[in-house]
């Protein structure tokens, strides 16, 4: 179906080009009278052959035998096309003065051909005459011989019975259907300088064209025109540019017309708008012209770079719309008055002045460094020097806080105090953990009171009951889950006190809970497995000799909590007299074999509780040393011999009703089993 449509379109195109129908075939045979017998005397016969427009006639002879005479004066066949005689033929073979057709083929110069046969009054021999055949054939108008005129300027397309012309891109076919006129109007040039030329320069410019070139610069510029290389525009010796001409128009005057072969002089237009028109006629073969245009304007004063800065680009002169930017050296910033600038560019105006004053390059000032919580800052470069490359030193309060980095900061080019690792934030003073003045010895049940600085991590929890906890950071407290059960929603009833030895002392550091986290595996009233909790404080507490966190156990801590290894526990719990201790008491107690402890509680079960892998036991087989009610949540601590710091290994959880009884060991939550849980809560709060 698509093929039929295409064939139909092609047929429509050809029919349009040739007319409403194909031309009738034109062909035939011509012979002399009596052929192939001899022809008679006094014979005159003419044939006028006609072909359709766009065709020509082709004729050749298959037999030719005429009387030979000087210049074919007696008998002859004459071929005529229009007014031109193509050939006069006689004889059988050509001589110096006579021509016989032989194997030649003859073509008409147009669509018609006249054939004339003539014989005189006598023939000495019998001559048999001629036989010729003719036919019409399409003329390829696009094929031209050397020296013939070309029918089309650019492209020639032949078809049966005719031809048509087309043009290259940038040209349009003139209404004469042969000439390609240039599309060269409406061109606009806005650059300060440039070149423009006639179409195809330096080749001959097109005929029948009208070109317009517009140079449009901003007000304040003056355009100058220089004709360069060569100039060749058709002229007339007696008239001023009647054929092809070049004219130049400004808002003030007109220049030209120009033609001929002499370069026109420089034209200083004193205008920012110039229109150049170029018109050509239908004849001639000239190469055209080329113009280099430039522009000038009132210059601005040469800019001067500020100290510690430079200007770019650097030019010999700066005129209208020229610009420059100011850049400061590293460590300096652009300042216009007191206003800092991200960048600066000035533009030359038409009156010869810059649109903005040049700024200064002021040294970067990082400003006073922020105060460091639990630390201080020292100026290294000089007293209160805070400008580019100045150095400061942050330090933590000695003994109680430590810093992981070296604390040295430099004022950098971006205006920020920056550490050697590229950090912009303040260093952190982390509390020192596990420092104590405690030495082994003493008891809770029959033990000794603690001295100031022995257990600075000890926390007193007051509410409906008395309990304890251990400070593990300056805003986190570790305790037993059962000690704070029910406090997750009623946190206001939880009174947290630190830095005291006497339970009823009026001098203490007060803290309030922000959040309470009880281990998700703890079930109140169903034993003490996972008896661990964290309290997030609303505010950080200040670390000092009497308030300091206990360390969390290292991975190697298990080797320090083996059976018979001694730990220490402190608290205000019940003493042997059955009353809560007024002073903070402590005792050193050994670790008990886990299986031995579990077996002991199987014999003397604590109601609803059993010893699990999440617990450890401590105490003496004979009794006498133990924690008791009121000590819940307190820390069972051990000394790390390698670091010489104390760490929390257990949390006071549960035990026999008879504290310190024979084979009635204290049971503690095993902290090493909960390090990931503790770190996850703290890191994600």
UniProtKB/Swiss-Prot annotation:
Catalytic residues (UniProt): 482 (charge relay system), 531 (charge relay system), 632 (charge relay system)
Disulfide linkage: 72-90, 152-165, 167-180, 184-211, 241-259, 300-348, 328-361, 366-411, 396-429, 433-551, 597-617, 628-659
Q: Which residues form the Peptidase S1 domain?
A: 444-683
Give a yes or no for keyword Membrane in this entry. Answer: no
Q: Name one GO molecular function term.
A: calcium ion binding
Task: Fetch the InterPro entries from UniProt.
Answer: CUB_dom (IPR000859), EGF-like_Ca-bd_dom (IPR001881), EGF-like_dom (IPR000742), EGF_Ca-bd_CS (IPR018097), NOTCH1_EGF-like (IPR049883), Pept_S1A_C1r/C1S/mannan-bd (IPR024175), Peptidase_S1_PA (IPR009003), Peptidase_S1_PA_chymotrypsin (IPR043504)
- The first-level EC class reads hydrolase
Chain residues that bind Ca(2+) 1: 67, 75, 120, 122-123
Tissue expression remark: Highly expressed in liver. Secreted in plasma.
Task: Check the UniProt entry and state the signal peptide residues, or none.
Answer: 1-19
Main subcellular location of this protein, as a coarse class = secreted
Domain Sushi, chain residue ranges per copy: 298-363, 364-431
Q: Where does the record place it?
A: Secreted
Please tell me one Gene Ontology term that the record gives under cellular component.
Answer: extracellular space
* Modified sites of kind (3R)-3-hydroxyasparagine: 158
Q: Which GO terms describe its biological process?
A: complement activation; complement activation, classical pathway; complement activation, lectin pathway; proteolysis
Q: Which residues bind Ca(2+) 2?
A: 138-139, 159, 162
Kindly provide the PTM information from the record: N-glycosylated. The iron and 2-oxoglutarate dependent 3-hydroxylation of aspartate and asparagine is (R) stereospecific within EGF domains.
Q: Which UniProt keywords apply?
A: Autocatalytic cleavage, Calcium, Complement pathway, Disulfide bond, EGF-like domain, Glycoprotein, Hydrolase, Hydroxylation, Immunity, Innate immunity, Metal-binding, Protease, Repeat, Secreted, Serine protease, Signal, Sushi
Q: What else is known?
A: Dimerization and MBL2 binding requires calcium ions.
Q: How does it assemble?
A: Homodimer; disulfide-linked. Binds MBL2. Isoform 2 binds to MASP1. Binds SERPING1.
Q: Which family does it belong to?
A: Belongs to the peptidase S1 family.
Protein name from the UniProt record: Mannan-binding lectin serine protease 2
Give the species this sequence originates from.
Answer: Rattus norvegicus (Rat)
